[in-house]
Amino acid sequence: MPGRGGQSLSMVCVDVWILALSVLSVMADATSVPVTESCDSQGPPGLPGPPGLPGPPGPPGPPGPPGLRGPTGIPGDIESCLSPPKSAFAVKMNDPLPAPSQPIVFKEALHNDQDHFNLTTGVFTCTIPGVYRFGFDIELFQHAVKLGLMKNDTQILEKESKAKDNYRHLSGNVVLQLTLGDRVWLESKLDTTETEKGPIQSMFFGYLLYGNYPG
């Protein structure tokens, strides 16, 4: 039956052809290189992140070089230095003391450069207000002495001593605040009959410690 034989042959040929295509397809898959995407591909840049926290301060830098010398300054004003005021005296006498309740007149000046002590009246007059020191020294023999240091008719200090058959020494000093025109002197407080027995030597002194300056 030639019709069936030709049909069978055609089917065999088709199967062989399909088999051949399958083998070729398998071989092609085995030898083909898989296609992959490139690893070098990059997307678009992202948005900037927020600022970071400040870092700690760095160590101090080395000293810089010396600067240039500045210009010479303007000369200052020259003021004269005033010397402090002076007032001092020292007087003595070798005579008996005068009658009481009056200034003792000292006839010899050991120092009286400013003439603030009056040798005629025996009175010191303040011409520089300030703080003064006044004092006296008496050497006596067979005498009774009583002295008062006066300021403007007010007794500030009183001293007395008696020497029968020997020598005695009597001294006193005081610090006074004086204003312009104040007067200071030394006077006897005993009657002259009590002081005219033996020799006597008297010294009276005073000097400015410091003046009263404004401000």
From Swiss-Prot:
Annotated transmembrane regions: none
Span of domain Collagen-like: 43-76
SMART domains named among the record's database cross-references: C1Q
Biased composition annotated in UniProt, kind: Pro residues: 45-68
Region (Disordered): 35-79
Leader sequence residues: 1-30
Subcellular location: Secreted
Domain C1q: 82-215
Keyword terms: Collagen, Secreted, Signal
Keyword Signal: yes
This protein's GO CC annotations: collagen trimer; extracellular region
UniProt name for this protein: Protein HP-25 homolog 2
